Design a protein with these regions (language model features):
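Exported/periplasmic ABC-transporter solute-binding proteins
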Residues: 1-29, 35, 40, 44-53, ...
Length: 233
């Protein structure tokens, strides 16, 4: 019998997985060995032949890895989506990002907006800036951008500590962070879909499928919603 399932997990799903893991472990009498990775690190793990039983990874990363022959999962499915969102330190002004006009006004009202440095292995900042450029907000956003070396959760933590006035990253890397007020998801015009794909590796033990079944259940879906993810049907 397998005593441990090795899991490769995207940073955007980290808060959910850390909440889900103890419940699954208690119910099934085994341990989840969790490895969290940015998209670039996920790719590097796959290129290096990293061994794992199951995972929740960014869908586009898995699709590219499959196309390149680096991943051959037994099966996979779209588990959840994390929209892009914005947050400010708790106690700050109640700003709005509900519409594109609101978002533009909020940017203009701030002096610094933290983004994850692409060197950290995530492409969120590039996607956000490209969308802002198309909408005429790029110059304003770039003038305020502060790039922090780390995934979105680290960037949000830095904002909570006062290193910048706001953060833009995945909602699931803002909502769970203590000391951050989640302003809401960015307007649809600014969105890029970050889908989380759950997968079972080829020749994985039956417990890996049990984890997939659990992730599809209502308890898991409720936890996902609580950290800013939108579960897929």
């Amino acid at each position: 019998m397998t005593d441990q399932l090795d899991i490769l997990c995207a940073g955007g799903f980290r808060a959910a997985m850390e909440a889900l893991a103890p419940r699954f472990e208690a119910a099934h009498g085994l341990r989840l060995g969790l490895t969290f990775a940015t998209p670039a690190a996920t790719r590097a793990h796959l290129e290096a032949g990293f061994s794992f039983h199951a995972g929740v990874v960014v869908a586009s990363v898995l699709a590219k890895a499959q196309a390149d022959g680096l991943a051959t999962p037994a099966h996979s499915f779209k588990l959840a989506v994390s929209p892009l969102g914005m947050g400010t330190p708790e106690g700050g002004p109640a700003l709005s990002v509900a519409t594109l006009a609101d978002f533009g006004a909020t940017i203009a009202a701030l002096e610094s907006i933290a983004l994850s440095d692409p060197k950290a292995g995530t492409n969120v900042a590039n996607e956000v800036l490209a969308a802002a450029d198309k909408l005429g907000l790029g110059e304003s956003l770039r003038a305020r951008a502060l790039f922090i070396n780390g995934p979105g959760s680290v960037v949000s933590g830095a904002v909570a500590q006062g290193h910048a006035q706001a953060v833009i990253t995945l909602a699931s890397e803002i909502v769970p962070i203590e000391g951050i007020r989640f302003l809401g998801r960015l307007p649809q015009e600014m969105q890029t879909e970050y889908a989380m794909q759950a997968l079972v590796a080829d020749r994985a033990p039956p417990a890996a499928q049990a984890l997939m079944d659990y992730l599809r259940g209502e308890e898991a879906r409720e936890i996902m919603r609580g950290v800013g993810l939108e579960p897929c049907s």
